[in-house]
Amino acid sequence: MGSQSSKAPRGDVTAEEAAGASPAKANGQENGHVKSNGDLTPKGEGESPPVNGADEAAGATGDAIEPAPPSQEAEAKGEVAPKETPKKKKKFSFKKPFKLSGLSFKRNRKEGGGDSSASSPTEEEQEQGEISACSDEGTAQEGKAAATPESQEPQAKGAEASAVSKGGDAEEEAGPQAAEPSTPSGPESGPASASAENE
């Protein structure tokens, strides 16, 4: 603005510039753009029509338009809507059995089990499974373990390998602790069973 007035001689102000400058500033518009700093009144100071009628319509509606915040709220609601319908969490499944700090996590195949406890058993569930497994196949191992209590670890590993080859869940859980309840007496059974648990 200053550069235009400095180039033109001071006395030669055209009628377009004079008419265009005063109504534009009265409506809060400059160079065809609406100034919106919050200090404007809904109607301009001057009631004179601007050079371009579309500019005033945009300026008048720009001041009067208040539904813009609801559209922003609608956008916010649109963003919230996907969060209201949470995605189903993918169930984690073990593909291979593994041991972590003495606990063995193995794949369970329970019929009709859709709960999370089937995929990650706790210590109590493992103990219950091992006790039931011991009652099934523990009688066969009792005779061997009672005869040679020093060979409990190799038997436990052998039982674990045979259980994996058979693919039975109860047999898999029998693992290294299967020989522990089978030999309740004897001084050698205490340390041997403790070492089997620590592995």
Curated annotation (Swiss-Prot):
It is a lipid-anchor. The keyword Lipoprotein applies. One of its GO terms (cellular component) is cytoplasm. Residues 16-26, 53-64, 175-199 have a biased composition (Low complexity). Keywords: Actin-binding, Calmodulin-binding, Cell membrane, Cytoplasm, Cytoskeleton, Lipoprotein, Membrane, Myristate, Phosphoprotein. A lipid is attached at G2 (N-myristoyl glycine). The modification Phosphoserine is found at S22, S36, S48, S71, S93, S101, S104, S119, S120, S132, S135, S151, S162, S165. Controls cell movement by regulating actin cytoskeleton homeostasis and filopodium and lamellipodium formation. When unphosphorylated, induces cell migration. When phosphorylated by MAPK8, induces actin bundles formation and stabilization, thereby reducing actin plasticity, hence restricting cell movement, including neuronal migration. May be involved in coupling the protein kinase C and calmodulin signal transduction systems. Belongs to the MARCKS family. This is MARCKS-related protein. It comes from Rattus norvegicus.
